[in-house]
């Protein structure tokens, strides 16, 4: 809860935390009542990355048109309180301003699990990211994510083949 207090002291309009529990579907629904695209910020350590992965797994089935999240990535080993202490409120506002879209975060986080220089690992990555798309409950959102992911895979294939994307 010290992170939330530090964020409030930095001048943020609102900040909440699940207080040591994983983000639940009920908490996600409450966040969406406050904002259609809340920004999630997890600690920049291994536990924070695991929490982010679990949160994404819980959010994907709940996505609806006009409802998503953005993710702000803290520097390695830092939590919000550390960042504010080191960089001041402006540093935290800057971090929030660079929050990534859910589809970008999903792509990057999944890709980081694989050495995509190897064809077998690249195939595993594509399989994993497509699996995430299949977990989206809403048909329209799942279709839109599928189109985006397939476009990124096609771009990656073209880069491997030495074809520049248009």
Show the residue positions of the predicted features:
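Short, polar loop motifs at secondary-structure junctions
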Residues: 1-3
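Short hydrophobic/aromatic-enriched beta-strand-loop microsegments
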Residues: 13-20
């Amino acid at each position: 809860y010290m992170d939330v207090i530090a964020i409030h002291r930095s001048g943020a309009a609102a900040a909440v935390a699940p207080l040591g529990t994983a983000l639940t579907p009920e908490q996600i629904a409450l966040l969406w009542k406050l904002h259609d695209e809340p920004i999630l910020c997890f600690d920049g350590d291994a536990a924070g990355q695991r929490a982010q992965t679990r949160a994404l797994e819980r959010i994907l089935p709940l996505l609806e048109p006009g409802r998503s999240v953005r993710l702000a990535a803290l520097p390695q080993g830092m939590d919000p309180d550390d960042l504010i202490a080191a960089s001041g409120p402006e540093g935290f506002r800057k971090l929030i301003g660079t929050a990534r879209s859910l589809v970008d975060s999903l792509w990057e986080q999944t890709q980081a699990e694989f050495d995509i220089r190897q064809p077998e690992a690249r195939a595993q990555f594509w399989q994993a990211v497509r699996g995430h798309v299949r977990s989206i409950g809403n048909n329209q959102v799942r279709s839109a994510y599928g189109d985006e992911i397939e476009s990124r895979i096609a771009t990656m294939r073209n880069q491997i083949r030495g074809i520049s994307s248009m």
